[in-house]
Amino acid sequence: MSAFTPASEVLLRHSDDFEQSRILFAGDLQDDLPARLDTAASRAHTQQFHHWQVLSRQMGDNARFSLVATANDVADCDTLIYYWPKNKPEAQFQLMNLLSLLPVGTDIFVVGENRSGVRSAEQMLADYAPLNKVDSARRCGLYFGRLEKQPVFDANKFWGEYNVDGLTVKTLPGVFSRDGLDVGSQLLLSTLTPHTKGKVLDVGCGAGVLSVAFARHSPKIRLTLCDVSAPAVEASRATLAANGIEGEVFASNVFSEVKGRFDMIISNPPFHDGMQTSLDAAQTLIRGAVRHLNSGGELRIVANAFLPYPDVLDETFGFHEVIAQTGRFKVYRAIMTRQAKKG
C-alpha cells in the first residue's frame, strides 16, 4: 500500500488544512494515507479486514475493524474524512453510523471517484451535514460540510433477506449479491454433489448462500466460512442461523486467519476491490489452497471466463478441469495430489 489512490491524492492537495485536526478516516480505505497524513491525531474505522491489517501495523489500536463503529472508535475526533465506496447503501450504513456518534460541529469531508457516484453524498447528507464541492481532480470529487444534526442510526433496519429454493439468505449493505443469487454462484452450486462429507471451507463467503445450499443436500459436511468483509461475516452467521445450519464464520484475508486443512475449498472469488480490478485475492486463494487441503482434497471455484486463472491453477496443482461453463462463467476444479504438494 505504498501508492496512493486518486482519492487520497486529492486529499493531499489540502494536507495543510489537516495538520491541526483530529481525524477519523472511514469508508473505502484502500491505501495507508490514514497512517501517513500529518495530523494532530488519526483514527481509522473499516469494515474490510485486509484494509485493517495494513493500517493496524502502523496505527495499532487506532485502526479498528468492525461492522458498526462505536463511540470509542470516534472518541476525540473533530473531523471525518470519508472515502466513498462504489455501493450507495454501504455508504449510507457507514455514514449514518458515524454521524450518529460524532459531535455536532464536526468537519465532514467526503471524497471519491466520480464513477463511484460520490455526487450522491450531497443528497444523502443534506439533512445532517450540507455539503459543498471544494475540489475536483483525478476524476474525483472532494466535498466539505459541517455536522449540524446527528442522524438516528439503527443497524437492524439495514438487514435484508431473500429466498433461494426454500433457503433464507440474510444480507447487509456491501455484501456481494445482496439482492439475489448471482449467476456465477448458481453455476457453482449446480456442480456440488449431494451427500458429500468432510470439512468444507467457503472462502469469500458473502451472505453464506453457497454454504447453506451445500449443507442442505450434504448435511454431514462440517462448514467453515470466511470473508474480508465485516458485513459478509455477520450476514453469513445470520444466514446459517436462519436455516438451522452450524458452521464457524470469521474474518480473514483469504487464508490469513485460517487454521488446518480441509477436504474441499469452495469460492466465488472477488476480482474487484472497491472500484479497482484486482486478481490478487483469487491468485492468493489458488496458490494458498495447497497448504489448506488434505491429500485428495479439492479446490472448486467459479470465475468469469475471461479471467486468467487456468495458468495459476496449472502452476499450483499441475492440472485443472473445467466442470461447468456458460458464456460468461467457468467452474474450475483442481485436486490436491503429490504433484501439487511439490508446487
From Swiss-Prot:
A cellular-component GO term for this protein: cytoplasm
Cellular location(s): Cytoplasm
Keyword Transferase: yes
EC numbers, comma separated: 2.1.1.172
Swiss-Prot/TrEMBL catalytic activity: guanosine(1207) in 16S rRNA + S-adenosyl-L-methionine = N(2)-methylguanosine(1207) in 16S rRNA + S-adenosyl-L-homocysteine + H(+)
Gene3D superfamilies xrefs: Vaccinia Virus protein VP39
Annotated TM spans: none
Keyword Oxidoreductase attributed: no
Major localisation: cytoplasm
Gene Ontology MF terms in the entry: 16S rRNA (guanine(1207)-N(2))-methyltransferase activity; nucleic acid binding
UniProt keyword list: Cytoplasm, Methyltransferase, rRNA processing, S-adenosyl-L-methionine, Transferase
SUPFAM superfamilies: S-adenosyl-L-methionine-dependent methyltransferases
Source domain of life: Bacteria
Pfam families per UniProt: MTS, MTS_N
Function description: Specifically methylates the guanine in position 1207 of 16S rRNA in the 30S particle.
Family according to the record: Belongs to the methyltransferase superfamily. RsmC family.
Subunit-level organization: Monomer.
The protein's name in its UniProt record: Ribosomal RNA small subunit methyltransferase C
Species whose genome carries this gene: Escherichia coli (strain SMS-3-5 / SECEC)
